[in-house]
Amino acid sequence: EKDEFYKKYKDRVGEIVTGEVYQIWKNEIMILDDEGNELILPKREMIPRDFFKKGDSMRAVVLRVEMYNSNPKIILSRTAPEFLERLFELEVPEILDGLITVKKIVREPGERAKVAVESYDDRIDPVGACVGMKGSRIHGIVRELKNENIDVINYTSNIQLLIQRSLSPAKVSSITLDDKTGKADVFLPADQVSLAIGKGGHNIKLAGKLVGYTIDVYRESNEDEDMDVDLDEFVDEIDAWIIDELKGIGLDTAKSVLEMSDADLSLIHISEPTRLRRI
């Protein structure tokens, strides 16, 4: 019986299962499947805003199957990219039918996800099909993931175009790629820099994971550049690591720093934004 249980779930790794919450501990939850088998959802595999009570129905993906003291242990996950992919398969028939392919998924569970999709049929808009009329298809997925923001991106093998799409909603001016180092320098208008970075830096971090490049954003130069002062001029008054952090998110001049809010500056762990502005 144990061998059958082990084999059943070993063959279901990567698939969605539905079960009932049976017992709740500090670091994990026990789920019972429809046959009364015990499955484990560790806290680290839960979305931060997940909250379950005994008797609740829940869905997760089978992450792995282990043997523990000769007993099968089934580990579930709600944070794995595969969970999001299976949810899309349930909501979007074109994916299950093979008309749309999910090329890659990256997630910051509960915060944001980026899903690159592609269709070999020119008559199908893969992004529109995944989102659905007025968001009808994606809304259910977002609710399941506790309001995780999901960006569906039309995949392309053109890296520059893929970077541009993955940084949406920011409007990119130009991109310089270094294939040897795997770095991409992205230039944007000043008012687009914070959009590219996103709340908590999630947008730029996920875009980098999606395309496989380290993305650095820079404020686009303009006619007022000669009235501005390069941050390097403040090296005697501002710690070098702070200047490097600011440059890393596209803030390379005094004016660009002044245009940022205290909240945005705090994202890079600057504890005294007021003092920084005064300098």
Model-predicted regions and their roles:
Residues 1-275:
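RNA-contacting regions in translation and RNA-metabolism proteins
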